[in-house]
Amino acid sequence: MAVPKRRVSKTRAAKRRTHYKVSLPMPVKDKDGSYKMPHRANPTTKEY
């Protein structure tokens, strides 16, 4: 089993964690002009 040779500093650990981000959902404009999530069925226009 791998064991770290030395302690990882708070700064170094934080720099590594900067890439763990949550991507924001990108809504798309529907035919009726409202913004919806992609790949979801729209109950008003009955479209996917």
UniProtKB/Swiss-Prot annotation:
Residues 1-48 are annotated as: Disordered. This is Large ribosomal subunit protein bL32. GO terms for cellular component: large ribosomal subunit. Pfam families: Ribosomal_L32p. One of its GO terms (molecular function) is structural constituent of ribosome. The keyword Ribonucleoprotein applies. Coiled coil: none annotated. GO terms for biological process: translation. Residues 1-20 have a biased composition (Basic residues). InterPro entries: Ribosomal_bL32 (IPR002677), Ribosomal_zn-bd (IPR011332). Belongs to the bacterial ribosomal protein bL32 family. SUPFAM superfamilies: Zn-binding ribosomal proteins (SSF57829). Keywords: Ribonucleoprotein, Ribosomal protein.
